[in-house]
Structures are given as structure tokens and as C-alpha cells.
Swiss-Prot record:
Keywords: Amino-acid biosynthesis, Aromatic amino acid biosynthesis, NADP, Oxidoreductase. Homodimer. InterPro entries: Aminoacid_DH-like_N_sf, NAD(P)-bd_dom_sf, SDH_C, Shikimate_DH, Shikimate_DH-bd_N, Shikimate_DH_fam, Shikm_DH/Glu-tRNA_Rdtase. NADP(+) binds at G127, A128, G129, G130, A131, N151, R152, T153, H154, T155, K156, M220, G244. GO terms for biological process: amino acid biosynthetic process; aromatic amino acid family biosynthetic process; chorismate biosynthetic process; shikimate metabolic process. Involved in the biosynthesis of the chorismate, which leads to the biosynthesis of aromatic amino acids. Catalyzes the reversible NADPH linked reduction of 3-dehydroshikimate (DHSA) to yield shikimate (SA). Shikimate binds at S15, K16, S17, T62, N87, D103, Y222. It is an enzyme of class 1 (oxidoreductase). The active site is at K66. Pathway: Metabolic intermediate biosynthesis; chorismate biosynthesis; chorismate from D-erythrose 4-phosphate and phosphoenolpyruvate: step 4/7. It comes from Shewanella baltica (strain OS155 / ATCC BAA-1091). One of its GO terms (molecular function) is NADP binding. This is Shikimate dehydrogenase (NADP(+)). Its EC number is 1.1.1.25.
Length: 282
């Protein structure tokens, strides 16, 4: 019997997930399908229920349904709990739904693939939305020394800090802080842009001195050409820039492993996906 998986979103036609999971499944000889499902903005729960009732085993969730998916779960992972959102749903044998958030795990996996260990790194995280929130715990668990969160609206960055400094009796209290963009100081090993500004060719209002010839800049956005943020980072002398395509493949791999118990080869699929992206009409 063929196991069914899907990604839910609105819009969803642009999703790379069916291609990625198809490539993950191909070498395993396992029988499964993965489709993109356009759920009505006001009909996600009904669409998901219908999918599971029809034999669906698991699902990915993207914009704008991650928070709704979180509310539907019977159990959630620590990453999902702190993110307040899920991107991966698993229908368990007892009929309950487990929610995971693999976005931050995908980010960390891609950073490690590119840079090696993140131990003792000083990291700047730009943005304080859902994308930022989902990657904080995985970054901290990867052993970074300090995480600075900076956002146009400072109160949102401070809210994230308050959430994470209360975790595990304050275990992260000395490692996470919020700083106004115009007050950023010192050098950073890694700067991560979690905002979607690059999609419209815009940049966060950052001081140029935060980038040195040792700084690696990571934009969660991606495209056929270098993103606006990464272009700016290179112009300021960054040592290396990375876009979010590897994070996309990485989070998908974590989902695939949760469902199938198999760790797929992400680098092969990332190369195929990059080639596919470059070949798409501009």
C-alpha cells in the first residue's frame, strides 16, 4: 500500500516540497506519494482532516497555517512548543497527531554543512517573526555562545528574548539578548536574516560595521540569483554568504526522517534543486 504525504499551504503552487520528498524517496524503494494541497484560508482543519481520513500518514504545513496546525496537535516537540508553530504533522498509530517544527533544525544542519561546528559562535539574528522564533532553540542547542536578536520593532525582539530566557529555569538567560538595530556593536561570526525583505529587494536598516571579513551571512530567502541581503553582505566584505535553499532541504529531510526513520542524502538533493531553480524561467 502506498503511503500518502502532503504539504498544505495557501498559496502552494510554488512549493518545492513535492520535488524534494520525491528525490528523498527515490533511493529508498519505499512506496509513497507526496502532493501539494491548496487549503482554503478558512478551511485548513477540514482539508487536513479529510486528508488523514483518506489515509494520509503525515503532512508539512506552510504559510499561513503553521499556528493553526499547532493548535490541532495532541502532542508537540520542544522545538514546536517554543516556536508556537509546527511545520510537520505525523498521524500516530493511536490516531493522535504529533506536531514538530523542523525549520530551525534545517537551518542548523545547513549551517553545520557549510561551516562545521557552531560551538561558541556569536550570532546575530535579524527579525522577530515566526521564522526567527522557530530557529532560536536549535541554534542555542547547537552550542552558540551568544545570540543577539534585532528587529525593526524592538519590543518584538524583546518578547522573544523573554520567552527563551524563561526556558529550563533560565538556562539560556545569559546567551540571548535583544538589541536595537542602531545600537548593534562588536563583531559577529554569523549574521542570519530571517526577514522576507530580500523577496522585494529591500534590506533591514543595519549598520555596516557589524560585517567583517570573518563574518558569514545567511539569508533564509533564496532565488536563482544572489538575494538582496547577501549582495549587500558581499559588498560589505563578508567572508561568505549562504541562502536558504539548504535550510529548505534540511527541514524537509528532518520531516522525512520523522515519518520514515531514514536520513536522506541532503547534498545530492540540494544540488538537484539548485539546478532546477536555475533552469526555471526568470
Amino acid at each position: 500500500m502506498t503511503d500518502r504525504y502532503a504539504v498544505f499551504g495557501n498559496p502552494i503552487s510554488h512549493s518545492k516540497s513535492p520535488f524534494i520528498h520525491g528525490q528523498f524517496a527515490a533511493p529508498t524503494q519505499e512506496s509513497l506519494t507526496y502532493e501539494a494541497i491548496l487549503a482554503p484560508v478558512d478551511g485548513f482543519e477540514a482539508s487536513l482532516t479529510a486528508f488523514f481520513n483518506a489515509g494520509g500518514k503525515g503532512a508539512n504545513v506552510t504559510v499561513p497555517f503553521k499556528e493553526q496546525a499547532f493548535a490541532l496537535c495532541d502532542s508537540i516537540s520542544p522545538e514546536a512548543k517554543l516556536a508556537g508553530a509546527v511545520n510537520t504533522l505525523s498521524l500516530l498509530a493511536d490516531g493522535t497527531i504529533r506536531g514538530d517544527n523542523t525549520d530551525g533544525l534545517g537551518l542548523v544542519a545547513d549551517l553545520i554543512a557549510n561551516l562545521g561546528s557552531l560551538q561558541d559562535k556569536r550570532v546575530l539574528l535579524i527579525g522577530a517573526g515566526g521564522a526567527a522564533r522557530g530557529c532560536i532553540l536549535p541554534l542555542l542547542n547547537a552550542g552558540i555562545a551568544q545570540l543577539i536578536i534585532s528587529n525593526r520593532t524592538h519590543t518584538k525582539a524583546q518578547l522573544l528574548v523573554d520567552i527563551f530566557t524563561s526556558v529550563d529555569n533560565g538556562a539560556f538567560a545569559n546567551r540571548v539578548t535583544a538589541v536595537e538595530m542602531n545600537e548593534l556593536a562588536g563583531e559577529f561570526d554569523i549574521i542570519i536574516n530571517s526577514t522576507s525583505a530580500s523577496l522585494v529587494g529591500e534590506l533591514p536598516p543595519l549598520p555596516t560595521h557589524i560585517i567583517t571579513t570573518q563574518t558569514v551571512c545567511y539569508d533564509m530567502m533564496y532565488g536563482a540569483s544572489v538575494t538582496a541581503f547577501n549582495q549587500w553582505a558581499l559588498s560589505q566584505g563578508a567572508a561568505k554568504v549562504i541562502d536558504g535553499l539548504g535550510m529548505l532541504v534540511g527541514q524537509a529531510a528532518k520531516s522525512f526522517t520523522l515519518w520514515r526513520g531514514i536520513e536522506p542524502d541532503t547534498q545530492v538533493v540540494l544540488t538537484l534543486l539548485r539546478d532546477k531553480l536555475m533552469a526555471e524561467p526568470k
